[in-house]
Every structure is written in C-alpha cells, then in structure tokens.
C-alpha cells in the first residue's frame, strides 16, 4: 500500500517540501536559517496573537495596557519579552540568511532572491510598526522621525506624511493604524514565504561549492530535519536565556517612559537591527539624499545578481572575494555601532566613510574582484 503522505493532496505538498525533498549532500549549518526563520515567524505570530488579546491601541491606554500585560496577565511578561526579543532573533537569523546568500552566490536564483528582498522589507516594516505600539518615548519619537523622512519626497512629501499620520502629528489615528498593519503584515509575510519556497523548489537548493549537485542528492528527512532541530535548539536556548536573564538588554530605557510630545529624548535611535541603515541615513547631510541612501542600503541587494562577474557561483574557492565579503561584514558592524552614537565628531566622519565603503564594496569592488579572479584562473 502506498504511504498516505505520498498520495493525500495536502500531505503530498508537505511531503515534497519537508520529507522526500532531494537536497544536496554537502549543505552546512548555514542552510539552517531558512527553517529557523520559519520558527521565528511562527513564534512571533503566536506570541503577538496573545499579546493583541490584552493590548489596547489607544494613546491614553496603550502604555498602561503593556504594563498590565507584564504585571497582571498570566505569563504576560514572558509573552511580551519573547515577542520583543524574538524580533531580535528574527533579524539575527535574517541577516545571517542574507549573508549566506551573498557568500555562496544563492542570489543567482533571482526569483527566490527578489522575493527574499520583498520579505526583508516587509519584516522591517512590521518591526518598525511594532516598536511604536508600547507608546513609550522612543516609540513616539522613533515614529515621528522615521515617518517624517517621507516629507523629503518632492511635491507630495508633506501630504503623504500627514496622510500616514492621520492628522498633523503622530497621534491616536497613527497608533491605531500601525497596530492594524502590524497585525496584518505577518500573515502577508507568511504568504510571501510560501512563494519564496515555491521558487526555491523550482530550482532546488544551492550548495557550498556552487557546483550543480543533481548527481549527489539525499532526502531532506532524516538528514536535514535532525540538523535543523539542532539549530532550533541552539536558537531557542539563546532566546530563552535572553528572555529569562536580561530581557531588556537590547531595548531602550527611554521606552519605559510614557510618550510625551513635549519632551524630546536626547538621542533618538531605532532598535539595534536598524542601526546600520540609520547610520547610512544620518551620514548624508541632505534629507532626500539620506532617505534615498536608506532605501538603497537594502534595495542594493536587488542588483547584486546583475553584478556577478565571476565564473564561479560560490565564494568557497575565491579567497580575494572572501576577504572583501568579511570586510563588508566588519563595515556593517561599524555602521551598527555608529548608528547608536550621537551625531558629533568623530562619529560623523566614521559613519560617512563606512557608508561609502558599504556601497563601494557591493557596487564596485565585488564585480572588479570577480573579473580579476577570472583572469587569475587562466594562469
């Protein structure tokens, strides 16, 4: 008798995606992050759902409702901190996942890569709107500063900002709509994930060597299910350690002060996972230029496939490209550090140099090194 998982219309889809999926035999732990991101999304949706049952999206009661969740709701504190720190875990996995794609040339699967970029934007938008919901000082001023950037758009800028605000400042209407979109977007993200996987399974997975592995495939289960479970245990250990021992480590103390439109915090900054983009934004003196650089800091990933000049897909056998890749990683750490510092000497100039280096590596140096390595291979 044929196994039900191979014949049932619904189970067949799951079977072909998780059980009998042919996978390259050489996948390393860098290929774990897709499943970890799926788990992160599930955790965020579940904790968010339970938080939404107790949260009120009204400027008068939002801050108090979060306090109520932490103090009075059964295990509300763990829900709140799992959700807040789960977002950090989400972004750690996201950035490692994108980094893996850049290193091993997975961007050559353009459909999968482009859906991935859309997913990255969607997750960033969701995280930004979620940060506004507790209605602390940094929530309010972060929302004001970031939405105000749209006023740099010529002609329609000011109208656009007031349309998003639902008034002449960040107020009740803004909070309500941000809550609505913050609730909606994860489900849209879930749908996009399905499309992401659909395109991935059209081409099959890449592997560390960048060489086609059609001749050497193994079933996803049990080999990679076990491997993914190990990654999951490590991630859950890290997340639960963070939540149970220092839940406010990655947060901002200013967010424990209720939002006050009359009092500006000394340093307005977003959560740590946006600091690199925030540093790029601040490093350009012109407002419109800064906004364009901010958007391009992520959108630049979309043109990476067009800039691939090497004859090899992966960087595994390309030491010069590897050096450049790790320079890019170091540069992103520098930008993240600069984004959290005040706007003064020497941080301004460091931020500007790091921003120029970021775009130079991706747009100029990587393609040039690829061409150079092609010539070196002829010797």
Curated annotation (Swiss-Prot):
Heme b b562 binds at residues 83, 182. It is found in: Mitochondrion inner membrane. GO terms for biological process: mitochondrial electron transport, ubiquinol to cytochrome c. Heme 1 (or BL or b562) is low-potential and absorbs at about 562 nm, and heme 2 (or BH or b566) is high-potential and absorbs at about 566 nm. Belongs to the cytochrome b family. This is Cytochrome b. The chain crosses the membrane at residues 33-53, 77-98, 113-133, 178-198, 226-246, 288-308, 320-340, 347-367. It comes from Micronycteris minuta. GO terms for cellular component: mitochondrial inner membrane; respiratory chain complex III. The cytochrome bc1 complex contains 11 subunits: 3 respiratory subunits (MT-CYB, CYC1 and UQCRFS1), 2 core proteins (UQCRC1 and UQCRC2) and 6 low-molecular weight proteins (UQCRH/QCR6, UQCRB/QCR7, UQCRQ/QCR8, UQCR10/QCR9, UQCR11/QCR10 and a cleavage product of UQCRFS1). This cytochrome bc1 complex then forms a dimer. SUPFAM superfamilies: a domain/subunit of cytochrome bc1 complex (Ubiquinol-cytochrome c reductase) (SSF81648), Transmembrane di-heme cytochromes (SSF81342). PANTHER family: CYTOCHROME B. CDD domains: cytochrome_b_C, Cytochrome_b_N.
